[in-house]
Amino acid sequence: MINYMIPKGFLCCGKHVGIKKRKLDLGVVYSEKLCSAAAVFTKNKFCGIPIIVGKENIKDNKLQSIVVTSGVANVATGEEGLKNTYRILNKLSCELNIKSENILPSSTGIIGKQLPIDCIITGINGIKSSLSKYNWEEFNRAIMTTDKELKIKSCKIGDATVLGIAKGSGMIEPNMATMLAYFFTDASIKAVELKGILKRAVDKSFNMISIDHDTSTSDTAAILANGYVGNVNLEVFEKTFTDMCIDMAKDIVRDGEGVSKLIEATVMGCSSFESAKVIAKSIINSPLVKIAIYGSDPNWGRIAMAIGKSFEDDVDPLKIEIAFNSNVIYDKGKIYEENFDCIERYLRDNNECKIQANLNVGDFAATVWGSDFTEDYIRINSYYTKRK
């Protein structure tokens, strides 16, 4: 049963072409009309070949298709990797009868392996007949690696629909945007406006999450607007779209490798938003904080340590307040031991835990989302390449 709304004019599919042993590993989305488009990419300097090609293809802010391979990242693959990406685009452009430069490529998976290109080219044969407006779950499965759950969201904005598909559960600390997020809308939005909307939404959502403090080589977030239903109120569109991005970002954290709890850290009372964000990220990226949350341990000292090691000028221990779910445990040098038991129960009984820190030096705040560390995270990542 489909429990999401589908924008007009978009078709998709997910196929098994032989990159993985059995699972779906090739996803394609196609618009019946050329779209205005925008995309943001990883800032990792060791980026994947599809990122290099994608940056070129998005320069004119027009796309008509997205193609994603999963299982092999096509990173550190040199000239052969570049040729393979162009072979995929050229083959798909012939099958869909569109320009290859209007296709955005992505790959996710193991770094340092070449794509099994012959299998992929064979799998693209006749792919247009596999496209359907109902195949979004198959597309989502085709782009997944260690994900456990589908990540599909949709919303209505006037007459227009926005559909979002994402993957990502490890190597997650986007800095733009392994995290992939694609959005499709039948609204008519000019490219220059779409670029601003996407960047601002990503900055408030995907760039505010972290699972393991590693920025992937392949992160991509893109939006395509084909204009089927006409104009929308851009202010309403941006707010609704941003809220959807935040929900999807939190879903990525919840589905993170070995994650048992989502951590929401809010740092307020800072002299700037950037300072608040740096300190909040320092909290959720601390292995000791993550492990304490996993063990339901109200170890506020680890939070204090994480705040201090941010090296931000805003940090003054005699002004700071630290709380769990608004239960204060430290305030300007005073420790509230009487709150330990209720905080411990809160951490034990909830799979989403809120940490607040008020630096009391300004008016700016930032909220970020992270996860705990469990034994499963180590198990999953200690033999990742051996499973492939």
From Swiss-Prot:
Active site positions: 178 (nucleophile)
UniProt-listed NCBIfam families: ArgJ, PRK05388.1
CDD domains with a match to the protein in the record: OAT
GO terms under cellular component: cytoplasm
Xref: InterPro entries: Arg_biosynth_ArgJ, ArgJ-like_dom_sf, ArgJ_beta_C
GO biological process: L-arginine biosynthetic process; ornithine biosynthetic process
Site feature location: Cleavage: 177-178
HAMAP family linked: ArgJ
Site (Involved in the stabilization of negative charge on the oxyanion by the formation of the oxyanion hole) residue list: 108-109
Pfam families tied to this protein: ArgJ
Keywords assigned: Acyltransferase, Amino-acid biosynthesis, Arginine biosynthesis, Autocatalytic cleavage, Cytoplasm, Multifunctional enzyme, Transferase
EC nos: 2.3.1.35, 2.3.1.1
UniProt-annotated location(s): Cytoplasm
Protein name, per record: Arginine biosynthesis bifunctional protein ArgJ 2
Family according to the record: Belongs to the ArgJ family.
Chain residues that bind substrate: 145, 167, 178, 257, 381
Disulfide bonds: none
Main localization of the protein described in the UniProt heading: cytoplasm
Superkingdom of origin organism: Bacteria
Subunit structure: Heterotetramer of two alpha and two beta chains.
